[in-house]
Amino acid sequence: MFEKILIANRGEIALRVIRAAREMGIKSVAVHSTADADAMHVRMADEAICIGPPPSSDSYLSIPAIVSACEITGAEAIHPGYGFLSENANFVRILEDQDITFIGPTSEHIRIMGDKITAKDTMKALGVPCVPGSDGGVPDYENAIKVAEKLGYPIIIKATAGGGGRGMKVANNVGELEIAFRSARAEAKSAFGNDEVYMEKYLTTPRHIEIQVFGDGKGGAVHLGERDCSLQRRHQKVLEEAPGPVIDAATRARIGKVCADAVARINYIGAGTIEFLYENDEFFFIEMNTRLQVEHPVTEAVFGVDLVREQIRVAAGLPMSFTQGELQVNGHAIEVRINAERLPTFSPCPGKVKVFHAPGGLGVRMDSALYGGYSIPPYYDSLIGKLIVHGRDRPEALARLKRALGELIVDGVDTTVPLFHALLQEPDVLSGNYNIHWLEKFLAEKLG
């Protein structure tokens, strides 16, 4: 087992990894920018080292700075958290060359799944159901017309190197195709430095269902059920729950086995998430995230496992501490992502937190790096906390979420907490009757 690991991240996920390491008797090293000198992850870690100025490009995304921090502190392994360098194949390849263990998959698996076309081709070959679409990238508008005619409208154009909704455009007819195609390419070039796009049939009312998988790197893999992440704004998840309100045990076992078998066949190591659109009882693969997800706590709650601990174990060469047969769904869990943003525009709201009080009680977990007197810097993502609740069933989890939101105090900055109070009044949310477009429509009607 490792004696010391470095966490190449900040905020609540850095704290999450520090906690798991401490329970395992492993020393932790926090890295931070000058803007994060007073951050909670810096205070909580056994050691801390400054890696650069506030901009992410000069600190949390600086591969030389992070590798140097590893060498200076003697850390044997790096946990990337999510975001930043967590899915950067070049970073992982450098660590492999330096004999520093990356707590996650191999650089090759990250590379394969990072290219959306290669990922789709790989998954299709492994027996995972995929959305009908173009064979590879679509080089020009003339080819786009042919692909759209073959698939039938509406179609969606996506960036090959994309994610997070960037470089993604919908065309409902041939009249909309040219503008959608050219703007998707331009957006992809701007966001990813690569203007290659591909096309898929656009599903009109799907849910976003993702399967948590975990591999040991030696041909063994399990699934830990699904999460429903359909409540989204601009392709960004807002609320996640497990199990999914519309997925029964037989469906879970079937699609879970397909996913576990797929990652087992490629000797995948560590945590991964296979994301699907789900419509008319059919699953369609969209992408695989080769890292821990923001929403991993809902899976931990219903399965009673520590996914970060498991990541560290398998990275150190130890076997998984559970088998598929031991993984049983227990109750229902819901997570809401709380951002420092001003409604109704969702504009970032950095500033000083005067008072912070986390809710408590049975089945309530708050993952946050906030504290009273902390100044939220303007340089990073606006996520300031995740409130996770667990109940014996979905109604109990919803009641617990409502109660916990009422206890949460973040004074000094605007947050998205009022949005969740509003959502918990909506019959569709309470019944689980929503798809990936529901929240956008709700916001347009209620917030104008």
Where do the PLM segments sit?
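ATP-dependent carboxylate activation and anion-phosphoryl transfer catalytic cores
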Residues: 7-24, 48, 71-73, 89, ...
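A polyampholytic, Gly/Pro-enriched intrinsically disordered region
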Residues: 122-131, 153-154
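Internal, active-site/partner-interface "lid" segment
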Residues: 134-136
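Structural detector of well-ordered beta-strand residues that form the stable sheet scaffold
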Residues: 29, 79, 101-103, 131, ...
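Acidic/histidine-enriched active-site and ligand-binding environments that engage anionic O-linkages
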Residues: 147-156
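ATP-binding N-terminal substructure of ATP-dependent carboxylate-amine bond-forming enzymes
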Residues: 1-126, 138-146, 396
